Regions:
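Metal-dependent phosphoesterase core characteristic of DEDDh/y 3'-5' exonuclease domains
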Residues: 130-142, 157, 163-164, 248, ...
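Structural signature of nuclease core domains in nucleic-acid processing machines
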Residues: 227, 237-290, 295-311, 756-771, ...
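Conserved catalytic core of nucleic-acid polymerases
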Residues: 399-406, 475, 522-524, 528-529, ...
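A common structural junction motif
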Residues: 648, 770-782
Length: 815
């Protein structure tokens, strides 16, 4: 009955758009079981469907059927249809006018079936039902959406990529499978968040009752917490707007704090002090989403917490490619609605939002944080090595990084403002010189930060006032590129070299460091950086300092206050050492076992000279060779890499020869590269020696460039991830040895850690730091028995890198 009713909806003589002129079968309606009340909507029939007269009967349909079956849905018991009912010529995407013409047919199908659950396949279906696009965005696919078309108002709606997209991009197969499984769970009622009851604590008696309840919780009680805040504690305008807690995931208690409409706006610090003993209980299992942030906030109010489970860190460890924000995770794992409610949480706006709306948002945060823990914990427990990494590295590492952020780095203000003035003068001279290379009529209004103006200057003919350069790279819109890679091609031109210098000095040195530092100092002359343990897919820490110049001109502004020394400890060539271990490269391993310098050996290999005859510049030139070719970089990319990162310039012939000599010197690296490429093509992921997983689905791409990048990532990710994990593990071990009255970690950058040590304790801590870093319990903790030694170089002085008198160094390399 239902089937014949649906068949009658089709009008095979339809002429509402031009598609009927090209289609073999006009007005193809859906197939499957309408009584299941599960509906899947694609875009339009393809060539095979047009020939057979049956939707989703081609290769895309085969993929869909297989994925549905894998997820526990019988493909014959769902109803599958399309937005557009006739095949567009050439299998192009349907146009808006075409799916508007077919709107009545799809609406009729929906009314006849009354689907409880709808899955949209591809951008056309997403646009048709939800009036939005961006199907590959994690905020649009695999999560519950709000339909804008009223005919779908009573349906659960989810979207994912079209199976035809998976055919073109095999690396998306995993994403597609996960979305189908999530949709299947939703149809079975397994994707349902527990509604969070919100308790707004607006009276002193209510607050006292809350504190009493927290204190009465049993041992091992799971408590989630979250704050909404503006700025950080060392900012003069810092404040916490509300604090929420939950111990069952169903009810969240939120205390309004500093806000114009808060009943406690004048007593918010006092209230937090009263919560201190209740929250600092060591027997509680504290859970947070990006808890390092919340802990820093609460520490500003005198509450010092160490949470046991971080939702964001767990999610990142399980899948580094997906979003880690709570909105996405609560939708993906719990089926929760998007709940931010249009709130603007930026520091300058948050106090203008209604306090009850902020508290309601905060309540959802703590409720869903609590509910997510068992889901992520279960996944971690199914992967023991990841669970160990989470428990032994990520969580304790988060607490150590939290303390580093709170301590901050000491800034010598006299140096900061002297350097700022010197740099401003130097940049002005550079811009004046660059203007001499252009017509007078351009000079006064010329903006070196304007892409169109710089493009005009670079690529206009000399007769018309430009430099007359030929563009070598183009943007997606077809315009000549002015980015660094494009401009590097002409760095022999004096004006281009000055432009590159200007960009480095103005945009990086000045705008990224000196100016923000000058306005961001706290009352103790410290700047506080932020580090993310989830910021890089390889597992590397990411933070504000990652791109800081190596020059002493900038770095020697950082140091230690009077009576203290700045101690810098760097791992020597740690990535090369890790690579030697993973690749089992015998020449490299032997060199490190004998205590040899690999950069010196490489310089000798490149020049044919004895060690005693190698100069400083020759060793410097060996560094990019060792690091660039380690992961299989090709000559052209290496040439730019060496120039950009090391200010070392190779001709193309030198690049090719250096690459050849490199792999002749280290023959086992080639076998390692081939092995990792084979592994990633078989599994679509690789695993580091410590157990960190790097998912690389793009290795299945039909685009060879994309595939090659995934293969390169398969080689370098385990090395970079392990090096970063070892650095974080060293920080954890070192923190146990530091007496805060005598020494403190104040920063980390790449392979190094910075400390402030009291002058009279430097002789004690320097050898201690070196010993801890070189003798980490990696085997005992992670089962990793490194086949090469770790070496740490430790030095101290009043300023960063042991520079005792950096005054008058000048802006090196830019004369």
């Amino acid at each position: 009955m239902y089937r014949s009713k649906l068949d009658k909806l089709a009008d095979h003589d339809c002429t509402q758009c031009e598609l009927h002129e090209y289609a073999m079968n006009v007005c193809l309606m859906g197939r499957g079981e309408p009584q299941s009340r599960i509906m899947i909507i694609g875009e339009a029939p393809g060539e095979n469907e047009d020939e057979t007269g049956k939707v989703f009967s081609g290769r895309a349909g085969q993929i869909l059927n297989r994925k549905l079956a894998d997820a526990g849905l019988d493909p014959e018991r769902v109803y599958v249809t399309n937005v557009v009912k006739c095949r567009p010529p050439g299998n192009r995407a349907p146009e808006r006018s075409e799916w508007s013409a077919c709107a009545g047919y799809l609406d009729a199908e929906v009314r006849a079936i009354q689907p409880s659950h709808v899955l949209l396949l591809g951008n056309t279906a997403l646009q048709r039902v939800c009036r939005t696009s961006g199907i590959t965005s994690p905020t649009k696919r695999g999560v519950q959406l709000s339909p804008r078309d009223p005919v779908f108002s009573s349906s659960f709606v989810m979207a994912t990529i079209h199976p035809a997209y998976v055919l073109r991009n095999p690396g998306q197969d995993t994403v597609f499978s996960e979305d189908i499984r999530r949709f299947a769970r939703a149809t079975r009622g397994e994707l349902q968040a527990v509604a969070v009851k919100k308790r707004y604590v607006a009276t002193i008696s209510g607050f006292k009752a809350l504190v009493k309840q927290l204190r009465a919780l049993p041992d091992k009680a799971v408590v989630s917490y979250d704050v909404e805040n503006r700025y950080r504690p060392w900012n003069t305008d810092w404040s916490i707007q509300c604090l929420g807690v939950s111990w069952d995931g169903e009810t969240a208690y939120v205390v309004p704090l500093y806000h114009p409409d808060s009943p406690f706006k004048k007593r918010w610090r006092e209230l937090l002090r009263h919560m201190k003993s209740a929250l600092e209980r060591k027997d509680l299992i504290l859970v947070a989403q990006n808890g390092k942030h919340d802990n820093v906030q609460l520490a500003g109010a005198g509450i010092f917490l160490e949470h046991k489970f971080d939702i964001m860190l767990a999610a990142h460890l399980l899948d580094e490619n997906r979003p880690k924000n709570l909105g996405y995770l609560s939708q993906a794992y719990l089926g929760a609605d998007q709940y931010k409610g249009g709130l603007d949480l930026k520091p300058e706006r948050i106090l203008k939002e209604p306090i009850k709306a902020l508290c309601a948002y905060n309540a959802e945060d703590v409720g869903y944080t609590w509910q997510l823990r068992p889901k992520l914990k279960e996944e971690l427990e199914a992967a023991p090595r990841l669970l160990r990494l989470f428990a032994k590295l990520q969580m304790p590492g988060s607490h150590v990084i939290q303390q580093v952020e709170m301590k901050g780095m000491y800034v010598h203000q006299d140096r900061l403002f002297d350097r700022l003035s010197e740099l401003q003068g130097f940049i002005q001279k550079r811009t004046d010189l660059m203007r001499s290379y252009m017509p007078k009529s351009w000079r006064q209004e010329f903006n070196f930060n304007s892409v169109p103006q710089v493009s005009r200057w670079l690529y206009t003919s000399e007769k018309k006032g430009g430099l007359g350069l030929e563009p070598v790279l183009f943007t997606k819109t077809g315009n000549a590129s002015t980015n660094e890679d494009a401009v590097l091609e002409y760095m022999d031109h004096p004006a281009v070299l000055m432009l590159l210098q200007y960009r480095t000095l103005q945009q990086k040195w000045m705008n990224t460091y000196l100016v923000p530092w000058s306005v961001g100092l706290d009352r103790n002359s410290r700047i506080h950086t932020t580090y993310k343990l989830y910021g890089a897919v390889t597992g590397r820490l990411s933070g504000d300092l990652q791109q800081i110049p190596r020059d002493a001109f900038i770095r020697s502004i950082i140091g230690a206050p009077e009576g203290w020394s700045f101690v810098n400890a760097d791992y020597s060539q740690v990535e090369l050492r890790i690579a030697a271990h993973i690749a089992n490269e015998r020449v490299m391993k032997r060199a490190y076992t004998l205590g040899q310098d690999l950069h010196m050996l490489q310089a000798m290999n490149m020049t044919g000279k004895a060690e005693k005859d190698i100069g400083k510049e020759e060793r410097k030139k060996a560094k990019p060779v060792n690091f660039g070719f380690l992961y299989g970089m090709y000559p052209k990319k290496f040439q730019n890499y060496a120039a950009k990162n090391y200010q070392v310039h190779f001709s193309m012939a030198e690049c090719e020869l250096a690459r050849q000599k490199y792999f002749e010197m280290f023959p086992d690296l080639t076998a390692w590269h081939n092995r990792m490429k084979r592994v990633v093509n078989e599994r679509q992921y690789v695993v580091s020696p410590l157990g960190r997983v790097r998912h690389l689905p793009d290795v299945l791409s039909r685009d060879r460039t994309v595939q090659m990048e995934a293969e390169r990532q398969a080689i370098n990710s385990p090395v970079q991830g392990t090096a970063s994990d070892i650095m974080l593990f060293a920080m954890i071990q070192l923190q146990k040895e530091l007496d805060p009255r005598e020494a403190a970690m104040v920063m980390t950058l790449h392979d190094g850690i910075g400390f402030e040590v009291r002058d009279d304790r430097v002789d004690y801590y320097e050898p201690l730091i070196k010993d801890v870093m070189e003798n980490l319990p990696l085997k005992k903790t992670f089962g990793l028995d490194l086949s090469v030694p770790l070496i740490a170089d430790v030095e101290h002085g009043q300023y960063w890198h042991g520079i005792d008198d950096a005054a008058g160094l000048g802006i090196t390399g830019y004369s």
